[in-house]
């Protein structure tokens, strides 16, 4: 297989995947209606712009003209696609859910409890059959039970799975899930300026990914104890709230420190991180443009470089598609002990260089490929089989002497 072809094909394949704004993404009220008030961690993923919208592109990836040029790569990709489709079909046959069409978003809430598995509630939005909870718990030896006329499924280990009156699927510890399945459930109001209010502000911007940490004092201490003395340990121990989010046009983060002095350090670190993000766009562009400019000088020296020369326009196009010019907008503000960072471009790849890894590999191939003369290793000396012992032939007996001729008689 030509080394350059699969690398170029996969880099170009990345340009086929996109993340677009989802105007129908859950609002903060919808995402947090079943929130666990004392949760230490919150995770939210909008599956529509990430998985559902891009799955058809994944299905057609092996038919991409550039990938089809490499039979081995295309065959390997089709094998993976077949396995993925097999898993998708198996899940659909077992529980009646198409993982790439029926799920729209999910939100998870976790509450730490020492070194054990945290208590949690997972909230899944989508299209679900009324008997889904029962079908999910049956293989685990679970039993059905009814909550406000809807069938839920209880597992032997204390988990409960059920559908709410609005059709949302909940799963988690029984004491957390059962009250949320009831028709009478109402979320607690969010106090102005609280951690939940900050999380809601981020969710109302309709990001496709959110990770928030609002640890209790005990959870923060336990987590910090697992990290050696370092800036990372201080980040854990000093935060009251941390939120990271990603949208179709950029990324952002919020950090609420225990005091303004540490918040000032976070502000400085955030400004430095943004400079690195800008450099992550410019450096790969510079490396690839330099390499492409130099390529013609090495024509005919290796098949890899010749193939790169053939596709140099596509290489530059991939650079433009997967990186930006580093000129995205960014604001870093500090108000007391709260630091807020917002970045924005025309698209996510203008801010977050999603192709930097692939382009880095490509640059390494372009700059590091050298013609190698074919070498033939000398054949190892052949082992001579030992000579078979030979039996000496007997020495022939000498022929008898002829009898003397008698003298003549006189």
What does each model-found stretch correspond to?
Residues 25-28, 37-39, 163-205, 252:
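Contiguous hydrophobic, core-forming segments of folded domains
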Residues 31, 106-111, 157-164, 240-244:
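Short, surface-exposed beta-strand/loop micro-motifs that present aromatic residues
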Residues 39-45, 120-124, 239-242, 249-255, ...:
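One face of beta-strands
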């Amino acid at each position: 297989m030509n080394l350059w072809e699969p690398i170029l094909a996969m880099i170009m394949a990345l340009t086929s995947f996109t993340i677009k704004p989802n105007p129908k993404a859950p609002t903060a009220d919808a995402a947090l209606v079943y929130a666990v008030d004392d949760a230490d961690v919150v995770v939210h993923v909008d599956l529509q712009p990430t998985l559902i919208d891009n799955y058809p592109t994944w299905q057609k990836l092996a038919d991409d003209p550039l990938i089809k040029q490499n039979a081995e790569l295309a065959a390997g990709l089709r094998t993976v696609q077949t396995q993925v489709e097999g898993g998708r079909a198996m899940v659909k046959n077992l529980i009646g859910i198409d993982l790439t069409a029926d799920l729209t978003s999910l939100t998870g809430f976790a509450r730490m409890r020492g070194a054990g598995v945290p208590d949690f509630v997972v909230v899944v939005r989508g299209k679900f059959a009324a008997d889904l909870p029962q079908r999910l718990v049956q293989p685990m030896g679970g039993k059905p039970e009814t909550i406000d006329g809807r069938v839920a499924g209880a597992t032997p280990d204390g988990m409960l799975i059920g559908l709410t009156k609005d059709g949302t699927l909940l799963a988690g510890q029984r004491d957390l899930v059962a009250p949320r399945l009831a028709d009478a459930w109402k979320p607690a109001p969010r106090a102005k300026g609280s951690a939940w209010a900050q999380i809601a502000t981020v969710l109302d911007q309709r990001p496709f990914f959110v990770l928030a940490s609002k640890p209790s004092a005990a959870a923060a201490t336990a987590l910090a104890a697992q990290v050696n003395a370092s800036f990372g340990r201080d980040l854990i121990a000093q935060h009251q709230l941390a939120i990271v989010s990603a949208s179709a046009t950029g990324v952002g983060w919020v950090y609420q420190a225990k005091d303004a002095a540490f918040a000032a350090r976070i502000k400085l670190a955030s400004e430095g991180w943004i400079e690195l993000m800008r450099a992550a766009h410019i450096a790969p562009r510079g490396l690839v443009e330099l390499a492409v400019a130099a390529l013609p000088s090495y024509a005919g020296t290796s098949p890899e470089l010749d193939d790169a020369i053939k596709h140099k326009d596509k290489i530059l196009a991939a650079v433009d598609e997967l990186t930006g010019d580093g000129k995205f907008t960014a604001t870093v503000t500090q108000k007391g002990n709260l630091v807020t960072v917002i970045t924005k471009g025309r698209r996510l790849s203008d801010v977050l260089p999603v192709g930097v890894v692939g382009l880095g590999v490509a640059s390494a191939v372009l700059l590091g490929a050298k013609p190698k003369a074919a070498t033939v290793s000398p054949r190892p000396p052949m082992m001579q089989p030992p000579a078979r012992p030979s039996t000496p032939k007997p020495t022939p007996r000498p022929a008898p002497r002829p009898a003397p001729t008698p003298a003549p008689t006189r």
